[in-house]
Amino acid sequence: GKTQPSGFAYELFLDEKGEKISKSKGNGITIDQWLEYASPESLSLYMYQNPKRAKKLYKEIVPKTVDEYLDFMEKAKNQNELQLLMNPVWHVHNGLIPQEDTIMSFSMLLNLVEASNADSKELLWKFVKKYKKDISEKEHLIFDNLIGYAIKYFNDVIKLQKKYKKPDTSEKLALEALVKTLNDCNDEMLPEDIQTLIYSTGKEN
């Protein structure tokens, strides 16, 4: 005859097809796997949002969640006290939100990993600093960690899903012409001249 205790209703996690996650099928991502590809704070954000709604939990959701985390971090810089309370990152960090400028999104960083074929943080930092000369690893610890996560995620998830088309005869000739053009370039040439040669090779083939 007493008042029933207040319960907390929650939904199960689903895979990318909307089906229940099964250990035997391996159709999801574990906590340990998430933490290999992104920060604990990004996982906390994912868990914090919409606890009563069934959510899809799979590897491809990680970049989107990380970018949401970075976006909330940026918004927090210009929010008042009331707005901060509505910002999930404020709760993720217990009110102590790190102050660091966002260099680029995680999705863009993944594209840079693919384009540069970088396999180490040091190499990827060199590419980043070509466009952002006033940044350093020590002053951007969150971004430094993101670089490591991006390389790991690309190699484990994106790269394994890549399917490369076998070039036909005309495409093979065009690629061979491009290789010859690049081999003819030297360190004394301006980037603009190299770009012009590459463009001309493409038009000719």
Where are these regions (language model features)?
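Catalytic adenosine-cofactor/nucleotide-binding cores of aminoacyl-tRNA synthetases and other
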Residues: 11-148
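Basic, alpha-helical terminal appendages of large translation-related enzymes
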Residues: 130-205
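Active-site cores that bind ATP or allylic diphosphates and position pyrophosphate for catalysis
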Residues: 1-6, 14-25, 31, 180-187, ...
